[in-house]
């Protein structure tokens, strides 16, 4: 039993109670109502401040200590129930997608939120809530805040979907229809939201309302049968707060304030908690399985439950403290992720890191390089905007300076070390180019739905053979159109054969060359002129006969899948045979020597500039936002990323300035990332939408440093936390930062904020409800 990880044992002990969660949620999803809301209420004139019919719903909460297995328990629901699984954020959604091997959208995507809704102003409800307000009043109070967005979503939905579309569909046909594609709000009544504690409270009622509206409009079987939506909220109400931001156009200022989150509304609002019977519908995960150190786990429980911090816990946290200068020194704790409270601190650290690297350019593994970020502000749009918001003196550059924060939030380039390098004021637009610095060999994550194009492999011979033997690449990329994955590997294998011949020539070993030439070549690889006896024509023994006897692999579209698989197997056998020959004639540890292969001849200039002899047309996929990619450099070579957008929002001269970043994934494959083109639209109170600006950047965030808020939900191997000189540090900040660690021995902090009485007593309001739930026999506790 010694070799079995503690985390595995902890997960297995919770398995029986996870089954109970599945059974409870299934029972909730089968509840019905005889009073389904009539959606004719919600016409163009409807205002939630005037109230409307009750929107029945049920809720099940899954909360607990960070790293306790809340998110992974969703896998059991995914396997046993027809449910729509979503994440509160892109990171949470992608994390689920990776765990479940199935696409999981964000909850915003699931209910129809679009980028144009970002700047729609939330309004102030006119409904007055008092202590004895019923659930209907609470529902429409929350809906009123978000009504501008909801109204636009239902308007677009009604245009796209015919009224009563599924009214004539039988029960059996509807069940089959629900299994054909990904779950939608109108094909299931179980909606799961991971990291729900980061969502503003109004999102819960928005999901409930839109479920009823979509199903009522389409006349689905679940609506006609009186089914009610079951919202499963997963997360922790004591971690990062939910925030509401509002932009004041007249003052050109962003106002950000804390607000109630979905979990605190369900747990802490008596009207809501009584309605959903929270004491019966709540599961609490107790033990941290991310880091199984007992003292560490005890510390997290103390922080989450708002308990008094004992001398032992305080002493344990104090042992993690190291001098701030060591954390801020880029040459200390190399390879560790730095966590900070603010974006400005992240930017400052990255700047000092880049300065340190620029003074030590002898390293080839950590080369510093720069790439442009481009921004274009349209003059006609600025003029229209100035008139609409009555700010006549506003200039394009002034608008850009005041809105850079909002722009950068779309792609997270706010953390990057940037400097302005050029400003070009033209007739139609003002174009600004920034230079941002990157570190080759550092790890990054992508922030959105970014396309990637596989172009090669860089690693060792043994690593590449391991990928071929395990077929992990084919398992990951060979589901929908396997011929493309096989064709990609065939081309890499075919081009890699030259590496063996080149090594044999350099070693001047005739026996090695002879061994390579004596490896039998399957007939499926042979050129027609060299098949059977025709292959016996005399050739120089010192030449690599492989390329004389074979043809390049066919493209995926030019032959059958069976033929491509046969070619792949033949090339794989030759590759392994050549590796064995190299090990025999060169060195026993040949497999650990450097190995590179690309789709076409590729050179790397200045250690970072990838130049391909031909346009890159590799295997396409989407980059995962939870995977870490190692930066390798950039390329200006033309890349085919599939279907081009119908209309670009950025001038051609600015698009041509942008290279594509080149990254290496965990298996060693080299990919080019598509650039991130963003357009920012101002949504005014009048309903007008003005396309103000377009930005071209790379849509990545550095794993070298990030804010504590961004790190929520991540597991980090080595963590250095700098709380800085902030006057008010929340207890939840300490909790989120420390709980990212997977190993308490690889965790350091610059100070212990809990030694400050104000921080120690900053206890989340939800903590008292969690402690009460621990003492409630009806609450399901999972250890």
Curated annotation (Swiss-Prot):
The keyword Secreted does not apply. Disulfide bonds: none annotated. GO terms for molecular function: ATP binding; helicase activity; hydrolase activity. It is found in: Host nucleus. The keyword Transport does not apply. Transmembrane segments: none annotated. It is an enzyme of class 3 (hydrolase). Associates with the primase and the primase-associated factor to form the helicase-primase complex. The gene is HELI. It comes from the Viruses. GO terms for cellular component: host cell nucleus. ATP binds at residues 64-71. Its main location: host cell. Keywords: ATP-binding, DNA replication, Helicase, Host nucleus, Hydrolase, Nucleotide-binding. Belongs to the herpesviridae helicase family. It comes from Alcelaphine herpesvirus 1 (strain C500) (AlHV-1). Pfam families: Herpes_Helicase. This is DNA replication helicase. GO terms for biological process: DNA replication. Its EC number is 3.6.4.-. CDD domains: SF1_C_RecD. Component of the helicase/primase complex. Unwinds the DNA at the replication forks and generates single-stranded DNA for both leading and lagging strand synthesis. The primase synthesizes short RNA primers on the lagging strand that the polymerase elongates using dNTPs. Possesses helicase-like motifs and therefore may act as the helicase subunit of the complex.
